[in-house]
């Protein structure tokens, strides 16, 4: 509720109180009432006035002197120093100071403050005009809208890629459901707290308002970024040590009230058509926040229509986040991370304003926007929070309701990309129990399609975007383990040396629109064996590109901090080098250079002295158990030929290793087509070399050496395909002869 006239009178009274003279000289006087207040100029002649009921004094009133009673039962006096022996005296009705609200305000004013302390306080905080001198105003028109229109995905798919349609089982359509959804409240987080903001702050009166808090603690309790979101504004609090934190306050700010002698104008750093940015920082902290003096500080966040949520995410948050990630500034508090945190808070603020547009939005577009909001929250936690994170996740009940209702409506979610976002929203809102198995099955099939599409080509920006979302799903759910294991092995198989090399080249490009442009499947995969030291060993004669350390830094930042969603892998120490391969529903392989986990191990004998390679097979239903001791071992069988009959070699992994350097590449082969592709000599996946060997890790727990294998492609399926192809060729030839004779 906004304060009424009585509240504003109380605020006025408090402001007058804060001007109260701290010297020993005071006076009290009354005159004729003017709008329930009294105003006199009083001469004291160098003596204090005693506050007695019948005390009188000589007052100047209309250029004449007269004696007047200075005490009234229904009034409280305020005395302000004008000049030597002269004070301005105000009377305010006593009733304004009764009640808890008045008590709250009065408790925030130090009536015993000395003049010296008052003057010291004047010089404590930085003023924009004096200490920062970087004020800027922006005149762009602000309007809640969506520049992507009805585009169902942020990054559109390539023209030549067919997007699978979603099959949904027959269900009952909820009553009142429509194919479009109003934007009202859709992207507004639940305000589940009542906050007392600015409590105890030197400059601001506290205010009570519905809000939500979100904190990102970098190292300890002293280094953090906090976001406080209210209906009208947000606050970014930046703390570097135990001193008073810096505050960035942005929005519609009539309820942000300053204590005297300060005014809002003293602290306005940026100003737009509808909103203001206040910065409150102590002068002795300016050396740590010197970026506040930069004239382009926050330009990328405020110099366009930031109420356009899609444009804001692209032009502001993703721009800042990409810069932070490429420069390795996560877990640091500097200009880059502060701008990113501000852009994140601004995105939450703008998303809540979407309801002002009052427009209808399609379900796919609404799901994409909501998934984008949750994805930037996930990145903020990944980049800024300590491990394990303590950040409170924001809840979006209206968006969750939309996702649930869409699941009940046949043919409402038409393509797989919308289903990916719907499931992502439910998983990130702690609604895993609502995700049906058929939904994750189709998402896993989509991951396999991307895998097959990019077996012989680099990942597109669209594929990186989709794999980014699916990789997060894998590590944020406990249900539907079979489908999640399939997505996990796809991400692992796509994490090849070729992908890592291409990824480092991408980092050399100066412009990336979205965080997903910097995503590689290696971030969510089971490959934990990539390091600068290992790459240097693999390519001793090559010059390491300057972007390789940045690529490895991004991997370190983006990789999950645990594998706890997989029962047979959760105990693996993530600080050590290994590869985890979930090749099938029941079988996993862990490839290491030492004994690391309990299971059936296959020691590789064809390595040089001093090098070891151990492949351990585990059951997906067996609880992970860490061990450094030798345990059950089996020998590796040498295979000279492979038959594709019955797809016995499907759902397997092809592992390439070097005698001296260990694992080089791992390729996942889901079906017979993948096996043929891998073993076809024209594709140069398996290359004959005296130092290079190839192992096939099968879905039944068997490990084969296939370095010199011959593929028997006589299975019935391939034979039928050959017959069909030959028939098609003959048919085309006959058609050609007929047309030629006409």
Curated annotation (Swiss-Prot):
<keyword id="KW-1161">Viral attachment to host cell</keyword>
<feature type="glycosylation site" description="N-linked (GlcNAc...) asparagine; by host">
    <location>
        <position position="641"/>
    </location>
</feature>
<feature type="disulfide bond">
    <location>
        <begin position="195"/>
        <end position="211"/>
    </location>
</feature>
<feature type="transmembrane region" description="Helical">
    <location>
        <begin position="720"/>
        <end position="740"/>
    </location>
</feature>
<keyword id="KW-0261">Viral envelope protein</keyword>
<keyword id="KW-1133">Transmembrane helix</keyword>
<keyword id="KW-1169">Fusion of virus membrane with host cell membrane</keyword>
<comment type="subunit">
    <text>Interacts with glycoprotein L (gL); this interaction is necessary for the correct processing and cell surface expression of gH. The heterodimer gH/gL seems to interact with gB trimers during fusion. Forms the envelope pentamer complex (PC) composed of gH, gL, UL128, UL130, and UL131A. The pentamer interacts with host NRP2. Forms the envelope trimer complex composed of gH, gL, and gO. The trimer interacts with host PDGFRA. The trimer also interacts with host EPHA2. The trimer also interacts with host TGFBR3. Interacts with UL116.</text>
</comment>
<dbReference type="GO" id="GO:0055036">
    <property type="term" value="C:virion membrane"/>
</dbReference>
<keyword id="KW-1043">Host membrane</keyword>
<dbReference type="GO" id="GO:0020002">
    <property type="term" value="C:host cell plasma membrane"/>
</dbReference>
<feature type="glycosylation site" description="N-linked (GlcNAc...) asparagine; by host">
    <location>
        <position position="700"/>
    </location>
</feature>
<feature type="glycosylation site" description="N-linked (GlcNAc...) asparagine; by host">
    <location>
        <position position="55"/>
    </location>
</feature>
<protein>
    <recommendedName>
        <fullName>Envelope glycoprotein H</fullName>
    </recommendedName>
</protein>
<keyword id="KW-1160">Virus entry into host cell</keyword>
<keyword id="KW-0812">Transmembrane</keyword>
<keyword id="KW-1168">Fusion of virus membrane with host membrane</keyword>
<feature type="signal peptide">
    <location>
        <begin position="1"/>
        <end position="23"/>
    </location>
</feature>
<feature type="region of interest" description="Interaction with gL">
    <location>
        <begin position="217"/>
        <end position="280"/>
    </location>
</feature>
<feature type="glycosylation site" description="N-linked (GlcNAc...) asparagine; by host">
    <location>
        <position position="67"/>
    </location>
</feature>
<dbReference type="InterPro" id="IPR035305">
    <property type="entry name" value="Herpes_glycoH_C"/>
</dbReference>
<keyword id="KW-0730">Sialic acid</keyword>
<dbReference type="GO" id="GO:0019031">
    <property type="term" value="C:viral envelope"/>
</dbReference>
<keyword id="KW-1032">Host cell membrane</keyword>
<feature type="glycosylation site" description="N-linked (GlcNAc...) asparagine; by host">
    <location>
        <position position="62"/>
    </location>
</feature>
<feature type="disulfide bond">
    <location>
        <begin position="330"/>
        <end position="383"/>
    </location>
</feature>
<feature type="topological domain" description="Virion surface">
    <location>
        <begin position="24"/>
        <end position="719"/>
    </location>
</feature>
<dbReference type="GO" id="GO:0005886">
    <property type="term" value="C:plasma membrane"/>
</dbReference>
<keyword id="KW-1039">Host endosome</keyword>
<feature type="topological domain" description="Intravirion">
    <location>
        <begin position="741"/>
        <end position="742"/>
    </location>
</feature>
<dbReference type="InterPro" id="IPR003493">
    <property type="entry name" value="Herpes_gH"/>
</dbReference>
<dbReference type="GO" id="GO:0019064">
    <property type="term" value="P:fusion of virus membrane with host plasma membrane"/>
</dbReference>
<keyword id="KW-1015">Disulfide bond</keyword>
<dbReference type="GO" id="GO:0098670">
    <property type="term" value="P:entry receptor-mediated virion attachment to host cell"/>
</dbReference>
<feature type="glycosylation site" description="N-linked (GlcNAc...) asparagine; by host">
    <location>
        <position position="192"/>
    </location>
</feature>
<comment type="function">
    <text>The heterodimer glycoprotein H-glycoprotein L is required for the fusion of viral and plasma membranes leading to virus entry into the host cell. Following initial binding to host receptor, membrane fusion is mediated by the fusion machinery composed of gB and the heterodimer gH/gL. May also be involved in the fusion between the virion envelope and the outer nuclear membrane during virion morphogenesis. In human cytomegalovirus, forms two distincts complexes to mediate viral entry, a trimer and a pentamer at the surface of the virion envelope.</text>
</comment>
<keyword id="KW-0472">Membrane</keyword>
<keyword id="KW-1162">Viral penetration into host cytoplasm</keyword>
<keyword id="KW-0946">Virion</keyword>
<dbReference type="Pfam" id="PF17488">
    <property type="entry name" value="Herpes_glycoH_C"/>
</dbReference>
<dbReference type="InterPro" id="IPR038172">
    <property type="entry name" value="Herpes_glycoH_C_sf"/>
</dbReference>
<feature type="disulfide bond">
    <location>
        <begin position="495"/>
        <end position="522"/>
    </location>
</feature>
